[in-house]
C-alpha cells in the first residue's frame, strides 16, 4: 500500500480552498449574457470553445493532490446540478464558492463548523420554500421561448425553435438535438409513430426516386416471433389480396422462404407487401408491439397467449392511413386505433415512468409516450465549422433541459434576482445558537454571488448594482445584456425554478461538507528509483577499459 500524505485543520482547508477557487474562477467567467468563452485544449483535434460551465469544470484536473480534492468536490456540484435540471451549473459553482469562502473565514475565526453547517442548511431550506412561493407556471409559448433564449446564452433563434417544437409535439413530447447539414438551425417534426427499423429487402421499394416503401391504407400484421415458413402466412395473404389492400408485416424477423415468397409476390404485383423487424428487444419489443397494436386497432399474434399465425384473420390486423418505410425507419401515420384506448395506454406508461428508478428506462418509456401521443421533433443544429457546431449543440441541449425544467416546476425572475428576493424574505430567520445564526447569515450573503458575477462579467460595478437590486422589490432587477434596470419577467429574463433550486441545494450540500472538513489524506507521489540496469552497464564499460 502506498504511503499517504496527511494534512490537518487550517493547512488542509487552505489547500482545499485554493482548489475550489481555481475551478470556480475558470467556470464563473461564463455566467450571464456577457459571459466570456473558455477554450479547452484536447489531446486530439481542434480546441473546443465553450460557455457551458459543466464542460469547463469537467476538464479541470490540478497537479497538487490536496487542491485537486477541493476542485473535484466543486466539480461534483456542477455535475449534480446538470444531472438534476440540465442547466444552472455555473450558478451552482458560484454559490458553492461563495459559501465555502464565507464559511472557512468563520471557521478560521474559531466558529464551530458543525453549527455553521446546520445554520447553512436551515437558510437553504427556508429559501427553497420561498423560491417555490415566488414561482409562477410557465405556460405560454412566449415564456418557453424566453427561457430557451436565456439558457442558450441569449440566442433568440434557439429559443424560438424550442418553443415551436414544444407547440408541435406537446410539452411531454420527445425533442432530440442532432447535427444539421446547413448553416441554419432547422426543426423537423415526425408525425405519427416512428421506430428505427427499415425494410427487410430493397425489393419492397415502390418509390425508387426516394428509395422508400409507401403503403396507402395498409393492413398491419403484428407477430411476436420469427416467420420463416410461408404456409403460416398464406391465410392472411389470401384475405389481404381479396380485400385489395397492401400489407405491412411487423415481426421479430421474416427470413428464408417466407421473405423470398413475399418479395416474389410484390414484384409480380399479386399482393403489395412490405416486412420490417419489430422495434426493441426482449420485453421492450413485446411492449412496443402492443403499443402499435393499440395505435392501429390490431392484435399482436403471440403464441404466449395461444394465438397461431395460421389462424389469423383480417379482424386481427391493424390499419393505418399511410405507412412510409426507408432503409432505417418505419413511420405509421394515422392509425385507426380508438382514442380512449390510446390515452389509457399512455396513462399506463406514465405510471411506469413514475415507478421507474433507472434514467435509461424512463427515457425509453418517455419516447413510447411521445410516439403514441404526438410524435417526435428533431432540432437540427446548423453551423459553419465543426467547433461551432459542438459549442452550439451543447447550448441547444442546455436550453432544452431548461425549458423542460420550467414547464415542470415553473419560472422565477432571472439574473440572480429570485435568490436575492427569497433571501430577503427569510432575513429574520434565527438558529438555535449564535454560531448557527452566523451560518444562516453567510448562506444568505452568498446568495448575492450569482448577481454579482453576472454584473462583473458585464464589466459593471457589482456592489452598486447589488445594492440597487436589493432595495427594489418583486421582479425588479438588472438586465446585464442591455445594462438597464426593470421588471425581469417583462424583459424576458427568466430562470426555471427547478434550475435555481437545484443549484442552491447542491452547492450548499457540498459546501457544508467542505466547511466541516478537518483532515485530508492523499497518496504521496512515488519517487522514481534509479535505474539499476543502466548503472550495471556503466560498470561493464569500466571493466572493458581495464582489460
Swiss-Prot record:
EC class: isomerase
Enzyme Commission code(s) on record: 5.6.1.7
Gene3D superfamilies according to UniProt: GroEL (3.50.7.10), GroEL-like equatorial domain (1.10.560.10), TCP-1-like chaperonin intermediate domain (3.30.260.10)
UniProt keyword list: ATP-binding, Chaperone, Cytoplasm, Isomerase, Nucleotide-binding
An example Gene Ontology molecular-function term: isomerase activity
Annotated ATP binding sites: 30-33, 51, 87-91, 415, 495
Annotated family: Belongs to the chaperonin (HSP60) family.
Subunit structure, as described in the record: Forms a cylinder of 14 subunits composed of two heptameric rings stacked back-to-back. Interacts with the co-chaperonin GroES.
Protein name, UniProt field: Chaperonin GroEL
Organism, as annotated: Pasteurella multocida (strain Pm70)
